[in-house]
């Protein structure tokens, strides 16, 4: 059992820890890949639902790389859904990709889920996703991953 083997089973113990360290649950987010979530059982789904009820974020990563369908979204209590790079690589020129992304964005938003597109590298991709109503964008268009020390030097020090 994934929940028990990872020591995550007692959500309420986690709630006590959060209170002890005096942080807002909204500062915490669990991320699980689409494939892992699809393979997990009811206990894991219930675990994530309890986290969301506590105010903790739950994000599905790499949506579109597995075998789930949009219909599965109604079974999971998510706060964020990350559209996989593979679904938006040619979104600015591929009508099929555009329609798929639009369906994912529309359904997710109808369920109150924030939508993030991963792997955005071109302005045209960003513009198309913005037009479709995507909430957030991630990717090399804005910068490559950097070590914490470099991030601090570039963005936090004046």
Please describe what each predicted stretch is.
Residues 1-12:
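Single conserved hydrophobic/aromatic residue that forms the stacking wall/gate
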Residues 6, 20, 27-42, 54-158:
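EAL-family c-di-GMP phosphodiesterase catalytic domain
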Residues 10, 43-44:
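Short glycine/threonine-rich loop-to-helix capping motif typified by GTGT followed
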